[in-house]
């Protein structure tokens, strides 16, 4: 019976009807006579053995099309069932076809491609495709979803081939669904005791700072209120460079960092914010996200970023702080299972290597192939010194220029990042382009091509439409140009 079905492409459940044990799954096996007959016998064969039926349906030799394959795989694996044979994911395909729309729900896609709302019938007559006899409203809606997936498959599969995205989809994106589903289920082990102790330490530090701030202010107030904090710092204490808005004084991090050495209270407030942020977001947030087995299980999102990078939610494990010693303590809370070790692996300067490859700049390629540190090599060229004479500060500035160029940084932004004048930053950039002329040519060419085509793409043909690059608005046009510079590199790296 399975052999008679294996040549068919089925629309697998695009939802589990909110039943984690999968008892609400309906499988629509199509509308053809042969398929319908096969489906009917198929269900009769496994009557009374729900798990056996699901394992047969989700075996590798039954080819299936679905929506949000990763999430369905996770549910199947979580219940000890097969999760094989998925040949197409309509959500993932729609994302590859247009990474900037942000509309990948089944109803949104159906409306977008067929210019009509997805109908949710309230009732259907019992048929050979229902496992449960009478068809409820929820089941009827499910039939509507499977029909929509079927229709979208017919549109999106040829579209990916038309856009030269099929190889990327079939060899990287779709196989990644299974990898991510297994990663989500595995989760990360966390040292709960250490996390609790860390949270208590943060509370003690924050409380001590709070009392110190009150003492320096001469009164108690809500430190977390920008309005009250602004009145204390700029109104009562008269600190300089205050910028008053319609809602009060600005007290964001940039403003306070510039005032850090004007008065001790400013440094105390910045420290207080660091402690309270670490406590609420990480010490407390991670504890709340921890499962009973001591592991945290995030959700990886494949259709969010415009460059193809993954994002992480519930909780976000991609923004664990590392820039401060205190923040780095959070990472130490993630521990391996007994008898295992955690391995931290990263590509070495992948975006700069891609810039060297895509631009074809011989000087930059030579710097990489020689095995020297690229930032030291850049500093030596930009500052006209021997590599052995490059100082830590020279390397730091060269590093900022290297990565800034990839993101289309301006002289003003670079000056802010490395603490020099705009004129100095401009001089660094001019020296950089004189050293790596191929990079300058690449930047000019890719922006011109994006303006002509209306899009940019990666080495794997992942595309991003750029209507902004033709905007009459300077800021919008500048944004489009920066994306044109960065997306081919960042997207290829992703």
Model regions and ranges:
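Conserved "right-hand" nucleotidyltransferase catalytic core of DNA-directed polymerases
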Residues: 1-45, 58, 64-67, 109, ...
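Charged catalytic and DNA/RNA-contacting regions of genome-maintenance
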Residues: 12-13, 41, 49-157
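Function-dense linear segments that define catalytic or interfacial modules
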Residues: 29, 104-120, 127, 141, ...
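Short, contiguous acidic/charged loop-to-helix segments that flank catalytic cores in large enzymes
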Residues: 42, 287, 318, 364-366, ...
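Glycine- and acidic
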Residues: 54, 91, 132-138, 160-162, ...
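Short, surface-exposed acidic
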Residues: 83-85, 117-124, 217-224, 240-247, ...
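Catalytic-loop motifs flanking and including active-site residues across diverse enzymes
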Residues: 89, 106, 145-148, 175, ...
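Conserved catalytic core of nucleic-acid polymerases
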Residues: 131, 185, 293, 297-298, ...
């Amino acid at each position: 019976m399975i052999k008679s079905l294996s040549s068919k492409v089925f629309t697998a459940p695009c939802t589990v009807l909110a039943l984690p044990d999968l008892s609400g799954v309906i499988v629509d096996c199509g509308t053809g006579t042969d398929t319908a007959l096969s489906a009917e016998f198929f269900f009769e064969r496994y009557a009374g053995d729900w798990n056996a039926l699901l394992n047969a349906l989700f075996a590798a030799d039954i080819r299936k099309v679905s929506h949000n394959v990763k999430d369905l795989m996770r549910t199947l694996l979580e219940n000890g069932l097969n999760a094989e044979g998925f040949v197409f994911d309509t959500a993932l395909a729609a994302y590859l076809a247009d990474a900037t729309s942000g509309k990948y729900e089944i109803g949104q896609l159906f409306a977008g491609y067929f210019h009509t709302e997805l109908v949710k019938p309230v009732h259907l007559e019992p048929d050979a495709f229902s496992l449960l006899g009478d068809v409820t409203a929820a089941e009827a809606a499910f039939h509507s979803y499977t029909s929509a997936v079927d229709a979208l498959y017919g549109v999106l599969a040829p579209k990916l081939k038309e856009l030269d995205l099929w190889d990327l989809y079939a060899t990287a994106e779709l196989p990644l669904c299974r990898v991510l589903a297994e990663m989500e289920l595995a989760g990360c082990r966390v040292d709960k005791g250490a996390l609790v102790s860390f949270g208590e330490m943060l509370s003690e530090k924050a409380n001590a700072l709070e009392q110190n701030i009150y003492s320096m202010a001469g009164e108690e107030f809500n430190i977390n209120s920008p309005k009250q904090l602004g009145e204390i710092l700029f109104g009562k204490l008269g600190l300089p460079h205050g910028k008053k808005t319609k809602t009060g004084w600005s007290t964001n991090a940039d403003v306070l960092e510039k005032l850090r050495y004007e008065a001790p209270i400013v440094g105390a407030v910045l420290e207080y914010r660091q402690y309270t942020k670490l406590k609420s977001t990480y010490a407390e947030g991670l504890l709340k996200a921890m499962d009973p087995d001591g592991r945290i299980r995030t959700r990886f999102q494949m259709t969010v970023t415009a460059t193809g990078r993954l994002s992480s939610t519930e909780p976000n494990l991609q923004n664990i702080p590392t820039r401060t010693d205190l923040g780095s303590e959070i990472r130490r809370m993630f521990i391996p299972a007994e008898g295992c070790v955690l391995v931290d692996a990263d590509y070495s300067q992948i975006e700069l290597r891609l810039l060297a490859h895509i631009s074809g700049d011989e000087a930059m390629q030579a710097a990489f192939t020689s095995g020297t540190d690229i930032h030291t090599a850049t500093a030596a060229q930009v500052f006209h010194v021997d590599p052995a004479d490059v100082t830590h500060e020279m390397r730091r500035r060269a590093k900022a220029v290297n990565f800034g160029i990839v993101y289309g940084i301006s002289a003003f932004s670079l000056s802010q990042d490395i603490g020099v004048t705009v004129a100095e930053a401009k001089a660094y950039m001019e020296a950089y382009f004189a050293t790596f002329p191929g990079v300058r040519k690449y930047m000019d060419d890719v922006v011109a091509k994006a303006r002509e085509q209306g899009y940019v793409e990666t080495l794997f043909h992942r595309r991003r439409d750029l209507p902004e690059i033709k905007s009459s608005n300077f800021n919008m046009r500048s944004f489009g140009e920066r994306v044109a510079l960065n997306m081919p590199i960042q997207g290829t790296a992703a």
